[in-house]
């Protein structure tokens, strides 16, 4: 860390940004998260001078949490215009009952908005203005919360979240707030002060206002020491991630969204939890606490069937079907009836007759007079039927004449439906066909597609050959697909 008086404030800030710029291709746009506070004001001003204002895009997020939010937005727009930088802003609604606290909810909403705006301008790099004092606060806060290695690693100088296209860079992370203040004073910059930053009811503010000033006289180098702790933790976390990547290759199916339960529980508890943490992060799911991960491992070890597994996390549900472990959206997509159905794959077909008790069965039937539609969107089912033009007799293809011969209907299973999957084959229950294909019960709540009163197509099974036997027909042909809106990427 550079002592605050060793060089001029301008020199150290410009040097820090020069290092960040050297990692970027020439002339690429640089998005800057601009709140209007001291830190981001210094970052925007210095970036405009070093990189050129034409490359800079100041992005502001209006949370609506302060009565001054509109004034802050106007100030930021005016400042960016004066510097010659482009400016954009987004208004977000911060959920106050999300269960994760107002600070975390605001942070999540802010990053989502920033990444959306970055995409709008084709920016692949987002500069953030956190500095060494922020890093010290983060490390100490994580220590007091009993965080693990990942938490103690705190903020990385450069980081790209899983599934994200934008790299977050923190060019000022090794500089002190005092150095940024000196820069702002040298250039007579104007910035806003968020009144909430002094509210010590928030843990971070309490550390900044009360705790860190008390540490400074007794431990003058505490910021350097905490920064080194973060670096050591980051190195240890990289090793844990390397181990988890090795384990994931051994435990995952061909589709890495699915793990083998037997292979997972062959690992010891700590290694299994490490793998689950890494796997969840690779899927873009919210992180889980050590206690939550330990509970997942415990339940996976103890579960004798899928009905015994019950792990919900951040709107998702951990599922077990046969030997497959996977996450599914948990917002009502699966029913209690379907969960019970998993417990005994060999139960009588009569059990399937209870499908009308499921959440899906409560969805209204939908109808469509087909006139060459390529997509039939069904919002209630969170998906679409897709009718793609294909050559005759391709897999799951039917004649256009059949599709237009009567109204198409999409409705829930009533129980006891039967279909033929091959010409001349026997009629079989949907339950048997789902089981044969290894479709978990919670994925069986799908809309059945009828033409008139005849069952035509079932997602994850295919075309009913009792309705269309593959015979030649005049005109075009369409392949039918069901595409859910919500998939883990």
UniProtKB/Swiss-Prot annotation:
The family database entries (SUPFAM superfamilies) matched by this protein are listed as: Adenine nucleotide alpha hydrolases-like, MesJ substrate recognition domain-like, PheT/TilS domain
What GO molecular function annotations does the UniProt record carry, in alphabetical order?
ATP binding; tRNA(Ile)-lysidine synthase activity
Reaction catalyzed:
cytidine(34) in tRNA(Ile2) + L-lysine + ATP = lysidine(34) in tRNA(Ile2) + AMP + diphosphate + H(+)
UniProt lists the family membership as follows: Belongs to the tRNA(Ile)-lysidine synthase family.
The positions annotated for binding ATP are: 35-40
Has UniProt tagged this entry with the keyword Ligase? Answer: yes
* Ranges in coiled-coil conformation: none
Q: State where the protein is found.
A: Cytoplasm
Q: What keywords sit in the KW lines? A: ATP-binding, Cytoplasm, Ligase, Nucleotide-binding, tRNA processing
Function, in words: Ligates lysine onto the cytidine present at position 34 of the AUA codon-specific tRNA(Ile) that contains the anticodon CAU, in an ATP-dependent manner. Cytidine is converted to lysidine, thus changing the amino acid specificity of the tRNA from methionine to isoleucine.
In the Enzyme Commission scheme, what number(s) does this protein have? 6.3.4.19
Which region is the signal sequence?
Answer: none
> Which HAMAP family would you find in this protein's record?
tRNA_Ile_lys_synt
Q: Gene encoding this polypeptide?
A: tilS
UniProt remark on domains: The N-terminal region contains the highly conserved SGGXDS motif, predicted to be a P-loop motif involved in ATP binding.
**Does ATP-binding appear among the keywords?**
yes
Q: What GO CC terms are in its UniProt record?
A: cytoplasm
> What is the protein's name according to its record?
tRNA(Ile)-lysidine synthase
Look up and give the organism this protein is from: Burkholderia pseudomallei (strain K96243)
Biological process terms from the Gene Ontology for this record are: tRNA modification
């Amino acid at each position: 860390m550079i002592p605050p008086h060793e060089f001029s404030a301008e020199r150290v800030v410009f040097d820090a940004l020069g290092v960040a710029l050297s990692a970027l291709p020439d002339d690429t746009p640089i998005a800057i998260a601009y709140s209007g506070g001291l830190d981001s004001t210094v970052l925007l001003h210095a970036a405009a001078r070093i990189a050129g204002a034409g490359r800079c895009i100041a992005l502001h997020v209006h949370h609506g949490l302060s009565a001054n939010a509109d004034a802050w937005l106007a100030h930021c727009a005016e400042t960016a215009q004066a510097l010659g930088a482009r400016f954009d802003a987004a208004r977000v609604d911060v959920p106050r009952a999300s269960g994760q606290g107002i600070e975390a909810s605001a942070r999540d909403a802010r990053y989502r908005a920033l990444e959306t705006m970055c995409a709008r301008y084709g920016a692949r790099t987002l500069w953030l203005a956190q500095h060494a004092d922020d890093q010290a606060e983060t490390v100490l806060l994580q220590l007091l919360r009993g965080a693990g290695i990942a938490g103690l690693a705190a903020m990385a100088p450069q980081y790209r979240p899983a599934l994200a296209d934008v790299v977050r860079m923190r060019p000022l992370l090794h500089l002190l707030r005092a150095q940024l203040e000196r820069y702002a004073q040298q250039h007579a910059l104007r910035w806003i002060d968020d009144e909430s930053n002094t509210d010590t009811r928030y843990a971070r503010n309490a550390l900044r206002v009360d705790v860190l000033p008390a540490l400074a006289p007794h431990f003058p180098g505490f910021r350097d020491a905490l920064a080194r702790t973060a670096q050591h933790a980051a190195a240890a976390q990289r090793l844990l991630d390397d181990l988890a990547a090795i384990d994931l290759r051994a435990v995952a199916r061909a589709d890495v969204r699915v793990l083998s339960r037997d292979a997972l529980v062959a690992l010891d508890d700590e290694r299994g939890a490490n793998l689950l943490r890494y796997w969840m992060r690779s899927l873009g799911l919210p992180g889980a606490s050590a206690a939550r991960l330990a509970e997942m491992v415990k339940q996976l070890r103890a579960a004798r069937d899928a009905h015994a597994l019950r792990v919900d996390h951040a709107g998702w549900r951990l599922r077990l079907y046969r030997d497959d472990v996977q996450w599914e959206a948990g917002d009502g997509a699966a029913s209690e009836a379907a969960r019970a159905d998993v417990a005994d794959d060999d139960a009588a077909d009569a059990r399937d007759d209870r499908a009308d008790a499921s959440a899906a069965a409560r969805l209204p039937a939908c109808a469509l007079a087909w006139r060459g539609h390529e997509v039939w969107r069904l919002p209630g089912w969170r998906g679409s039927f897709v009718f793609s033009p294909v050559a005759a007799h391709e897999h799951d293809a039917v004649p256009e004449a059949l599709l237009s011969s009567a109204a198409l209907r999409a409705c829930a299973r009533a129980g006891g439906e039967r279909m033929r999957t091959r010409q001349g084959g026997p009629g079989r229950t949907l339950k048997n066909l789902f089981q044969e294909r290894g479709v978990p019960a919670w994925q069986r709540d799908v809309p059945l597609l009828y033409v008139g009163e005849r069952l035509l197509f079932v997602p994850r099974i295919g075309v009913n050959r009792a309705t269309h036997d593959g015979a030649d027909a005049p005109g075009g042909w369409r392949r039918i697909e069901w595409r859910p809106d919500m998939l883990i990427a």
